[in-house]
Amino acid sequence: MFLINLLMYIIPILLAVAFLTLVERKVLGYMQFRKGPNVIGPYGILQPFADALKLFIKEPLRPMTSSISMFTIAPTLALTLAFTIWTPLPMPNALLDLNLGLLFILALSGLSVYSILWSGWASNSKYALIGALRAVAQTISYEVTLAIILLSIMLINGSFTLKNMLITQENMWLIMMTWPLTMMWYISTLAETNRAPFDLTEGESELVSGFNVEYAAGPFAMFFLAEYANIMVMNAITATLFLGSPLSSNIPYINSMTFMMKMLILTTTFLWIRASYPRFRYDQLMYLLWKNFLPITLALCLWYISIPISLSSLPPQL
């Protein structure tokens, strides 16, 4: 029974990630006035499965001078973390209803840095190492902003539990009163998942492919799946925190459908941004965080602390 539960949890995520790759290629294709994949299956719908089959039947090569254990562990760790981070999300019921769901998500997103660092270091390649160091610096930097925004949300919510976020937003979405935080959160999630215009780790003109340049076949596919699973989970968290489904409906399917629609719209916006914006320069990326986002988020965090106290009101759970 445990194995069936695990499969019922993992397989939908894998299918969602597979079709996200197809949606991305279709969106980019139509934005560039072409069709995208349209040969394999009707309208190219079987393209992700053909790609997966091709990748997993190829021989996984590795450099002679690489560290075997770390080189193998890094993609496995990346995919495991990408799947585990889904567990506390209320859709509308969570697989694990944790009391400290927000902290759990923050901790796991921080751990993903290790898989990137290990893959870059174990490859024993200059390009891979530079890409990994860039990714680590970028991810750790933007996690500071994400943590402060989560702290502000927690102060409004009065709890670390994600289920309470939906209760807090029964009457009004949190985006209405915290729209500056929402904008900064969304841009920070772009940087956190290494997506355009912040994909400095995969700068093809500079670093060939970044930290995963030496990976091929199955391990490369695992990194690819982890990246897209992280994109989806970040948008799921955004939908929960700022666009929480109201619990007015007693039918769980309706809540799940509205949640998935919000997540799909946010994910499509990720793809739209990729098609529209050029890549940032690395110093501009860091300047945006440390000189712009950090002071504003700190000021807003103090604002959200002081307002309830000054108005003599406390969060609903206290």
Curated annotation (Swiss-Prot):
Q: Which Pfam families match?
A: NADHdh (PF00146)
Main location as per UniProt: mitochondrion
Hydrolase recorded as keyword: no
Name the PROSITE patterns for this protein.
Answer: COMPLEX1_ND1_1 (PS00667), COMPLEX1_ND1_2 (PS00668)
Keywords attached to this entry: Electron transport, Membrane, Mitochondrion, Mitochondrion inner membrane, NAD, Respiratory chain, Translocase, Transmembrane, Transmembrane helix, Transport, Ubiquinone
Look at the named UniProt entry and state the broad enzyme category this protein falls under.
Answer: translocase
Compartments it resides in: Mitochondrion inner membrane
- GO CC annotation: mitochondrial inner membrane
Q: How does it sit in the membrane?
A: Multi-pass membrane protein
Under which EC number(s) is this enzyme classified? 7.1.1.2
Example of a GO biological process term: aerobic respiration
PANTHER family to which the protein is assigned, alphabetical? NADH DEHYDROGENASE SUBUNIT 1, NADH-UBIQUINONE OXIDOREDUCTASE CHAIN 1
**What function is annotated for this protein?**
Core subunit of the mitochondrial membrane respiratory chain NADH dehydrogenase (Complex I) that is believed to belong to the minimal assembly required for catalysis. Complex I functions in the transfer of electrons from NADH to the respiratory chain. The immediate electron acceptor for the enzyme is believed to be ubiquinone.
Family indicated by similarity = Belongs to the complex I subunit 1 family.
Q: What is this protein called?
A: NADH-ubiquinone oxidoreductase chain 1
